Amino acid sequence: MPSMRDLRRRIKSIKNTQQITKAMKMVAAAKLRRAQEMVVASRPYAKRIKDVLARAAAATTETAHPLLIKREVKATGYVLITADRGLCGGFNANLIRKATVELKEFSNPKLITVGRKGRDFFKKRGYEIVGEFTNLGESISFDAARVIAGFIMEKYLDGTFDEVYLVFSEFVNPLVQRPQTLKLLPLEAPAEESGGGEYIFEPSADAVLNTLLPKYVEVQVYRALLESKASEHGARMTAMDTATENATEMIAKLTLQLNRARQAAITKEIAEIVGGAAALEA
């Protein structure tokens, strides 16, 4: 059985750790609120640009845009969005596990990684990484998404990739994050929804389509980054909450052991005193 000194040392150490996990939980909760607001705000915009793109594609008379043309698949681009840091439960592990399984289906996969965790994992295993992006910060900017989307489109148009998949974590709530795979390129023009009135395109549907297609890719990347960031904060908040609760349970168990050890020591001392007194009387 551990000594009382060891028990006190362990209790103190766990209490210090508990303070850290509690603080990290509070920080993650504050960041999650902001990230969640950005996710909610981005979804209607992504839906609207998809609707306008569908109507422009239906009205165009021009030959297919390069981002719409399907070609023989010789190399597959795989964009994986993970976190730069850990301590967020199974967030990174779930995404990496999904990517590991899906990459086996491609004969010549080439990765673009967003976040250190995914980059480090696949670099150690010898996968070809043609682009990496880290340190995007806690608040994802559209400029950052534009840079990443521009790099993806550049590699697609120059023939490095013949198709591109985007893997990210969809935010459902702080307890639930779902890894998702989205085929990003070549784009498939969304089906036009009925209703909503007629659209008049200026200067033409072709010009609008040519402008919207790259913007659509940027919006999809931006939404994926926002969803993943909110998922990361939600997973970290949940993980730190669980760690704090586990620390509370461990402190309670160790305190009980300490009290029992203290009681045993007191009982032993009393027995020795009584025994000594009895020996003197004899």
UniProtKB/Swiss-Prot annotation:
Gene Ontology MF annotations: ATP binding; proton-transporting ATP synthase activity, rotational mechanism
Classification via Gene3D superfamilies: 3.40.1380.10, ATP synthase, gamma subunit, helix hairpin domain
Keywords: ATP synthesis, Cell membrane, CF(1), Hydrogen ion transport, Ion transport, Membrane, Transport
Coiled-coil annotated spans: none
Disulfide partners: none
Annotated compartments: Cell membrane
SUPFAM superfamilies from the UniProt entry: ATP synthase (F1-ATPase), gamma subunit
Function, in words: Produces ATP from ADP in the presence of a proton gradient across the membrane. The gamma chain is believed to be important in regulating ATPase activity and the flow of protons through the CF(0) complex.
Subunit-structure text: F-type ATPases have 2 components, CF(1) - the catalytic core - and CF(0) - the membrane proton channel. CF(1) has five subunits: alpha(3), beta(3), gamma(1), delta(1), epsilon(1). CF(0) has three main subunits: a, b and c.
Protein name per UniProt: ATP synthase gamma chain
Organism of this sequence: Carboxydothermus hydrogenoformans (strain ATCC BAA-161 / DSM 6008 / Z-2901)
